[in-house]
Amino acid sequence: VTLQKFSSWTDLMDALNSGKIDGASVLVELAMGAVSNGIDLKAAALGHKDRNVVIVSDDISDVRDLKGKTFAIPSNQSSHNILLNDMLALGDLSIDDINVVQLAPSEMPSSLASGSIDGYCVAEPFGAQAVVQGYGHVLYDSTDLWQDSICCALVFNGGFLDKNKEAADEFLSTYKEAGSLLDEGIAKEVAEKYLGQDEKTLDVSLEWIHYDDLDISLDDYEQLSEKVKEYGINDNPPSYNDFIYQ
């Protein structure tokens, strides 16, 4: 397997949709949107389970304190957008009550530290980074807002699957097995190699996140589908059978 890094979701999705790459770890809503627009993609497994966090500056102690503030998410088509909407509802707020900006996850901790944003929702390790470095604190964990939430997924181009089903099945089996066997020590070694974070940040991050049971269940996907419709992210999400590789 050859790994290729992309600097933006747009570039990654263009490569995946066109078949320039065979598969990717991607925000699941982006892949759902592509399928709704006629692109042949299949989601095969989760990237991780739960534990996206809402990080806010120290002057914010309640969701209602976010009114009029600036909040960052990685993409409008993301579970982080869903979690933001779910959280705002707890304080009788709506998305119109705050200023939402899209930022690359790696830019979120420094933006919070500089005061250009007041909070963000993101996957690891960028939540732990702000906590460890003293830029902010956790207001909500995704499990508080949406149990068994789906965020990133391993997604294959349909053309690749048509021609390489046996190889894809072998890869997927090994991928899921790796998740079930992964302990914090091994995960930390891999994270140190690729993520460029300090040891304390990785220790905190790996306490929050887990990789066992990476199957995409029907119940969890149907809940996701309802939420993307509710919040205007995708009015016509693909069905489980059309989108989930089985």
Named regions from a protein language model:
Residues 162-235:
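Secondary-structure end/capping motifs
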Residues 230, 236-246:
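Hinge/cleft segment of the Venus flytrap/periplasmic-binding protein
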Residues 28-30, 101, 105-190:
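Pocket-lining segment of extracytoplasmic ligand-binding domains
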Residues 1-93, 100-102, 118-124, 135-139, ...:
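Short, glycine-/small- and polar/acidic-enriched structural segments
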Residues 35, 89, 131, 192-193, ...:
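Short polybasic/polar patches that bind polyanions
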